[in-house]
Amino acid sequence: RVLLFEKRRLAAQELEERLPKGQRVADDERQSRFVPLRRGEQPSIHRFPRGPQPGTFLHGLLELAAQEGFATLQDAERCRRWLAPRCQRRGWGEWSDCLSDWLGQLLQRPGLVPGTELALGELPPSRYQSEMAFMFAASKVDVQQIDRLVTAMTLDGQPRPALQRDRLNGLFKGYIDLVLEHEGRYYVLDYKSNWLGATAADYSEAAMSRALLEHRYDLQYVFYLLALHRQLQARLPDYDYDRHIGGALYWFMRGVDAENGGLCHQRPPRELIETLDRLFAGQPVEEIDHAG
């Protein structure tokens, strides 16, 4: 089977400044929030510090685990030995056992791909690429037109913060946390460290959808899938969007103990991806006036 993979991480700064003040594309949590453990309270992933630095640390663990090989860290004792020094270096030694248990849950959680029992720890390195780079040109692409298209055809057309008027010029580039292949279908997987609440129940489908809308992750996963669409189109002779694209997996990692595992699956319609492909290629496109 053909795999695409080369090395590198997401930016999406090109669209960041088009959001109203206080809203940012592809942003998890900007504010650091540390709530000390009360005496006798056991650490849990729901109590782990929040903010950019802890979020980057959690993302980094998954990136390193991918490089190590997810399967190699499924052994609990090996995972603890691997994780402990990394926590110590950050001054989070008291969280080492908690994070080791949490990482084990992530690796062993079935249902990574919808309709399957696949777990992250079962993926061989030949079936995924961590931090995959993408890049494509933009010439006077209307940001608000992108916004209208994406809003109409994702998340049931629900309201979300609008992008400000502007045009994209130059190279649009970024990095995808993980691209994986399973049974001939390709998925983009993005790790999210957002804190949605203090319990597993706070990571409901509705809560995750609200987070997607609030942070405009719809734009993020649409561009990821556009990049994947273009790469597969170039490398698979028989490529077909409906057959080969599995969609976007958003993993709200603090909710791994929720009934749904904190996993959110989105798959925009072929029409949207192909329309955006033409738009970035400088071809005229028609507006889409229906929700999907």
What residue ranges belong to the model's regions?
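Structural signature of nuclease core domains in nucleic-acid processing machines
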Residues: 1-292
